[in-house]
Amino acid sequence: MNENGDITSLFDKRINKELVKAGKAIRLALFTENKSFEWPAWEILKETVDATPISITEDVKVTLCENGALRKTLCVEKRHDDSFFRQYIHLYEGVLAHRIDITNEVDWQSTNALLKAEFPLNLNNEVATYDLGVGSVQRGNNILPAYEVYAQYWADLTDANGSYGDSLMNDS
């Protein structure tokens, strides 16, 4: 974890593999210029998501808020202007040791801005699999015209050779 409370390294000891791309971090990323013609929550332009987001670095505080035998939880608090962010990063032992849960609480007070969770994984594949609610679809990553994807509950990115994959799940 870096000084901003962002995850800069996840190492899978089972196969000796770093999961976060070098120089990147799993983080909340803030785009401060969300240009939209009418509907900023739905009309996200490619130029917005292709811009370099800013790191959230104000008033960062990291604490250990749970220290159980099977689960440890870090609490990361930070702010940007009037918006406040709290993340709970749950790390597990035993049969769930391969899993990390991140719970976000956001008091969003920003205007004309966009918040995204970034997961720059050290996996290579031009195609990912996304849920549709009643099925799934495989499609390209960050391509025109479909640079935004409709993955409500989960997305899976597996190496092109099928040797390793990670899934991101959402329960909201």
Task: Outline where the language-model segments fall.
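Catalytic and substrate-binding regions of extracellular carbohydrate-active enzymes
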Residues: 1-106, 111, 117-118, 141-142
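A generic secondary-structure signal for well-formed alpha-helical elements
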Residues: 108-114, 123-128
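Polysaccharide-binding surfaces and accessory modules of carbohydrate-active proteins
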Residues: 119-172
